[in-house]
């Protein structure tokens, strides 16, 4: 009996001996699913229907239970239901509007769920009627636009956004959702911008608005002109762009906070004790306990903003106090059902409150810092496809930032120094860096730290080649800017050089296994050319002459790695095979590195012999280097400071299609009109006649 009740919707028992009675709304739904026009026997049928509390489960279930032939028999009634839902949105009676919005959601979901194989045009015909579709959808979008932009209830606005999210995500592939053509024609872009630019509405609806915008931008973006892409690319209104940045910033901040909380819990707990007892063999297990589900929807919104809108770059650098989200009492905001577990957006009132006490010693932050911290967490673990994609998206965003002139200017600005506490993967051979020891530096140092951290920590069997290539490209783009603008950055360059040499060492040690899956010569060439950049132009951007000397010291100290690399690429390039050409490019690229090694090594050996020293100190090697620069001959290499600019299509199109599909499925799973309790809504509007 309990099973029957669940299936039939909300049922009411009169007594244990009598059959349970169906509630009135369920009986009215049943009438719609009969062939006859329900108004035949009840002229006020539609008026009454929208005064009834919606039974979403029953209505969706009923739609899903029909096969194609059965559906076509009641198509006129379904079209009529859709039409009256749209009409009800213009009613002054708020309860009718609430019920109409929820009914529309059930219609969109139910019809699509049952007819997954049907074409978009068939779906439109079943749901709206093809001849009336343009008019009905225009009316629907205008009503939603009015509700979102009006001074009405915040709950209604929330419901409108949830309906739109429901509509956008009913198909697995967003670009196959033909109904969205009407959302393109009847744009709600301005309504979304209005929400983002207003402090109050942003705090309540910002998250859903940003996710909705990110999805709409990806509708048929490669096949046709998408008006949301065009409009987003030209937004120059500061409050709107700030609002967009604020929503993204807070979603990422909340993720970082949750991760930090979990990390602190674990440090004082069982895994910490166990690790200290038996070494670090359990670190991987302990680390997995820290995983908080990543938030690709917000990351996609950040990507689209950075990629499409040059004005948004300024938002990345806007400073504001860094507030401990856990310690600050926040006005509770209902968790957005589109938010995955672990990414509930915090109250945006925290940053919007002008009365916040500003402590002069308070660390300042900005969206870029928050994003770098987020990336440092996400990029730690790339073992599964989901996290790998998250890390890839972070690196794509950083690629767009690294090749933007304005972004590079503030990244390297000596007057904008920040202390950025990146998360570092637990490793046996290194201690955890104390946060307070991190100096205030230009932001580019944090970006380089993040790249070095990734290079050092992902040399493993399941080698993420694509991420490594992107990482090295980001470093290259930053160095190109430094060379071009003669920026002498005070950075621990030795850590970068050491990480890159160890990467080459790893490629050599795992040549056979890696070559079965990857073109390792492409990555090796990029790394060698980074060294060529330092060798050829280092005197124009390294901070001091001694930094340039240290570069030579590192190359000489680790000469065995470069010698082995040369032997390997020479062997491969002299044999016929698929890697002949890429290997020969590395051979040519090594000319200056080999010249340095072959020039200085005999001089160092001679110095040691003359002075009867078995092992030279670093200072002694540096002395030999400085005294013998004048006799060193290097070859001028062209194109070292050139790079291919990022382009989404065609290279990244497949990645973004799959990413949007994954986000869409997640939003569909989490968007639920029942989470915004009907009882709460109806109670809110019960006094409105």
Swiss-Prot record:
The chain crosses the membrane at residues 520-538. It is found in: Golgi apparatus membrane; Cytoplasm. Its main location: Golgi. Pfam families: ARMH3_C. Keywords: Cytoplasm, Golgi apparatus, Membrane, Transmembrane, Transmembrane helix. One of its GO terms (biological process) is regulation of Golgi organization. It is a single-pass membrane protein. GO terms for cellular component: cytosol; Golgi membrane. Belongs to the ARMH3 family. May be involved in Golgi maintenance and protein secretion. This is Armadillo-like helical domain-containing protein 3. The lineage of its organism: Eukaryota, Metazoa, Chordata, Craniata, Vertebrata.
């Amino acid at each position: 009996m309990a099973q029957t009740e669940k299936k039939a919707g909300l049922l009411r028992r009169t007594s244990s001996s009598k059959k349970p009675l169906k509630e009135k709304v369920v009986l009215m739904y049943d009438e719609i699913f009969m062939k006859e026009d329900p108004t035949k026997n009840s002229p006020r049928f539609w008026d009454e229907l929208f005064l009834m509390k919606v039974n979403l489960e029953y209505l969706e279930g009923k739609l899903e239970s029909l096969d194609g032939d059965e559906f076509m028999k009641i198509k006129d009634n379904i079209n009529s239901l859709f039409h009256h839902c749209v009409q009800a949105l213009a009613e002054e009676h708020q309860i009718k509007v609430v019920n109409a919005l929820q009914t529309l959601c059930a219609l969109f979901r139910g019809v699509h769920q049952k007819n997954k194989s049907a074409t978009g045009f068939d779906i439109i015909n079943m749901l709206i009627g093809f001849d009336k579709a343009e008019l009905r959808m225009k009316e629907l979008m205008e009503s939603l636009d009015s509700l979102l932009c009006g001074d009405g209830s915040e709950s209604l606005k929330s419901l409108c956004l949830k309906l739109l999210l429901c509509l956008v995500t009913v198909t697995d592939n967003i670009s196959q959702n033909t109904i969205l053509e009407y959302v393109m024609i009847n744009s709600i872009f301005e309504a979304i911008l209005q929400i983002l630019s207003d402090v109050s509405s942003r705090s309540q609806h910002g998250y859903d608005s940003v996710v909705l915008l990110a999805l709409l931008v990806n509708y048929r973006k490669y096949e046709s002109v998408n008006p949301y892409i065009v409009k987003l690319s030209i937004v120059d209104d500061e409050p709107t762009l700030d609002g967009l940045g604020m929503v993204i910033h807070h979603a990422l901040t909340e993720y970082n906070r949750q991760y930090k909380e979990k990390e602190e819990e674990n440090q004082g707990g069982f895994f910490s004790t166990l690790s200290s007892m038996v070494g670090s063999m359990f670190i991987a297990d302990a680390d997995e306990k820290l995983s908080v589900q990543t938030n690709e929807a917000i990351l996609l919104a950040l990507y689209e903003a950075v990629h499409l809108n040059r004005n948004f770059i300024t938002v990345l650098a806007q400073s504001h106090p860094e507030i401990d989200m856990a310690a600050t009492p926040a006005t509770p905001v209902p968790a957005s059902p589109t938010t995955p577990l672990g990414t509930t957006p915090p109250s945006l009132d925290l940053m919007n409150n002008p009365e916040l006490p500003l402590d002069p010693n308070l660390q300042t932050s900005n969206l870029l810092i928050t994003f770098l911290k987020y990336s440092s967490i996400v990029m730690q673990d790339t073992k599964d496809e989901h996290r790998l994609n998250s890390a890839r998206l972070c690196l794509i965003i950083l690629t767009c930032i690294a090749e933007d002139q304005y972004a590079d200017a503030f990244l390297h600005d000596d007057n904008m120094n920040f202390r950025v506490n990146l998360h570092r993967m637990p490793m046996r051979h290194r201690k955890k860096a104390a946060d307070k020891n991190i100096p205030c530096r230009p932001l580019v140092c944090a970006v380089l730290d993040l790249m070095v951290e990734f290079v050092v920590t992902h040399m493993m069997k399941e080698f993420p080649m694509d991420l490594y290539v992107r990482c090295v490209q980001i470093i290259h783009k930053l160095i190109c800017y430094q060379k071009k603008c003669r920026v002498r950055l005070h950075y621990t360059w030795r850590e970068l050089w050491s990480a890159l040499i160890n990467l080459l060492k790893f490629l050599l040690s795992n040549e056979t296994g890696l070559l079965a899956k990857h073109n390792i010569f492409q990555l090796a060439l990029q790394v060698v050319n980074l060294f060529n950049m330092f060798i050829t132009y280092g005197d124009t951007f390294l901070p001091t002459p001694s930094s340039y000397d240290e570069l030579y010291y590192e190359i000489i100290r680790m000469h065995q790695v470069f010698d082995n690399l040369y032997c390997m690429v020479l062997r491969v390039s002299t044999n016929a095979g698929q890697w002949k050409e890429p290997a020969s490019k590395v051979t040519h690229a090594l000319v200056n590195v080999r010249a340095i090694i072959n020039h200085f090594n005999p001089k160092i050996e001679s110095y040691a012999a003359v002075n009867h020293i078995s092992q030279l100190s670093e200072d002694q090697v540096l002395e030999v280097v400085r005294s013998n620069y004048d006799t060193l001959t290097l070859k001028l290499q062209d194109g070292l400071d050139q790079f291919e600019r990022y382009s989404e299509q065609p290279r990244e199109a497949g990645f973004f299609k799959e990413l949007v599909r994954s986000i869409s499925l997640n939003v569909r799973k989490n968007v639920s009109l029942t989470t915004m309790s009907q009882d709460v809504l109806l109670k809110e509007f019960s006094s409105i006649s």
